[in-house]
Amino acid sequence: MSHTMSQSQPTTVKHDTLFTTPLDKAARFSFDEQVVACFPDMIRRSVPGYGQVLAMLPIFARRHCKYRQQSDSGQRVSRIYDLGCSLGAASMTLAGEFEPQDLQIKAIDISPAMTTEATTLLNDNYPEHDIEVITADIRDIELEPCDMVILNLTLQFLPAADRVAVLEKIYVALSEGGILVLTEKTHAFDEQYDAWLVERYYDFKRANGYTEMEISGKRNALENVLITDTLDEHHARLSDVGFQRHLTWFQFLNFVSIVAFK
């Protein structure tokens, strides 16, 4: 049944110290080599519930990946897209729970620094699995028919005007019975609720060792780079592109994960 995941991150994980010194306020966050070097630590300490979201992906895949596609060799497989894959954590989580012949995974990210490291990690840990890492803008690629699409903390980095088109493309590519897993940071429509959630999120980061300077520095760097939607906006957009059924299956403070059914 499963292959135990032997390694899901670089052998030497650098501590996230990117914002320990004051930065130029005009500097913007980017997924460059510096971020790649400490990315696992950054995610662990700044994205509540990320591990739980990853752990559920194989469970969802077991239910909805029904080998509806065909590999180059003619074998029945389930094709899965990991869009905005970063270091390939979602792809590795899936590979660790499926036989190599069961899945064809396409992991895509716009950052060459990310895809270079992801390729190394995936090749080192799952050399027998059919996993292709692609450096590309997800707005520009054509999706092949697939059983599952993972969009973890990715849509929020796209211009708002481009988000519908990406979701439309995903909806068309999904086979009947397939799913989209959409995980995003959100904001609440009510300003008081949102302020409470944001402050509790900063408390979460403080509890994980981030200083006030680091919290402020990253907030400034992400301004106009990471643009959140409300939960209602996400659900409305999914309905608009054709998904008739979608639900919020996970929420931790202002981070949510939605599953949408084709």
Swiss-Prot record:
Binding-site list for S-adenosyl-L-methionine: 50, 84-86, 137-138, 152, 219
Keywords for the protein's UniProt record, in alphabetical order: S-adenosyl-L-methionine, Transferase
Catalytic activity: prephenate + S-adenosyl-L-methionine = carboxy-S-adenosyl-L-methionine + 3-phenylpyruvate + H2O
Enzyme Commission number, as recorded: 2.1.3.-
Cross-referenced SUPFAM superfamilies: S-adenosyl-L-methionine-dependent methyltransferases
GO terms, molecular function: carboxyl- or carbamoyltransferase activity; S-adenosyl-L-methionine binding
InterPro entries for the chain: CmoA, Methyltransf_25, SAM-dependent_MTases_sf
GO biological process: tRNA wobble uridine modification
Record's function text: Catalyzes the conversion of S-adenosyl-L-methionine (SAM) to carboxy-S-adenosyl-L-methionine (Cx-SAM).
Quaternary structure note: Homodimer.
Sequence similarity: Belongs to the class I-like SAM-binding methyltransferase superfamily. Cx-SAM synthase family.
Protein name listed in UniProt: Carboxy-S-adenosyl-L-methionine synthase
Source species: Psychrobacter cryohalolentis (strain ATCC BAA-1226 / DSM 17306 / VKM B-2378 / K5)
Underlying gene: cmoA
